[in-house]
Regions:
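A residue-level marker of the well-folded mature domains of exported/periplasmic proteins
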Residues: 1-179
Length: 179
């Protein structure tokens, strides 16, 4: 249930902030997604929940595909699709620009440092096309928020309601879901 709530929170944020969310004005709401562990049930559910709520999910094996998309510059990745949303008569495309499992070189997953490095790579690739940062947990979300999203005023959504993420809401952290 929490996974769907996280996705709905992101969608509600887009609708509430439609006038300012599209940072470069291209009509595409681009988001990046930090995936904790591709084989972990919580990670699978959270990825599916976000993709389902935003309409970017593609059905696979009876559910929304939770496979990392890698980079998706043109919206043609096979594991996600572009979605359309209408906000007060204005239509936006929602696109998952990039997603990856946050696994470090030692094999540890849900890795905050890897997420902090990933946001730097994604920023170099996508720049102001990134309108939202989404993470399967607050540890990775806070790493991306502190490394890039906070200074660039990009809303970041995590999961777990860690105390640092709750405190960061006053600094622009978009939201978090409590387990």
């Amino acid at each position: 249930q929490g996974a769907e709530l996280q996705g709905q929170m992101v969608l509600d944020y887009i609708k509430k902030n439609a006038d300012t969310i599209d940072r470069n004005g291209d009509g595409v709401i681009g988001y990046v997604l930090a995936i904790g562990d591709i084989g972990h049930n919580d990670s699978i559910a959270r990825t599916r929940g976000v993709r389902s709520a935003l309409g970017t999910g593609v059905d696979a094996d009876g559910g929304v595909d939770s496979t990392p998309a890698g980079t998706n510059v043109d919206g043609k990745a096979k594991v996600v699709q572009d979605a359309k949303i209408d906000v007060d008569g204005k239509e936006f495309t929602v696109r998952e620009l990039a997603s990856q499992e946050m696994k470090n070189s030692a094999g540890a997953t849900w890795d905050a440092a890897t997420a902090g490095n990933a946001i730097g790579t994604w920023e170099a690739s996508f720049g102001d096309q990134i309108d939202i940062v989404v993470s399967n947990n607050d540890g990775m979300g806070m790493s991306m928020f502190n490394a890039w999203a906070k200074d660039n005023k990009v809303p970041t959504f995590g999961y777990d309601a860690n105390s640092d993420a709750v405190a960061a809401i006053a600094e622009g952290y978009g939201g978090r879901i409590s387990q």
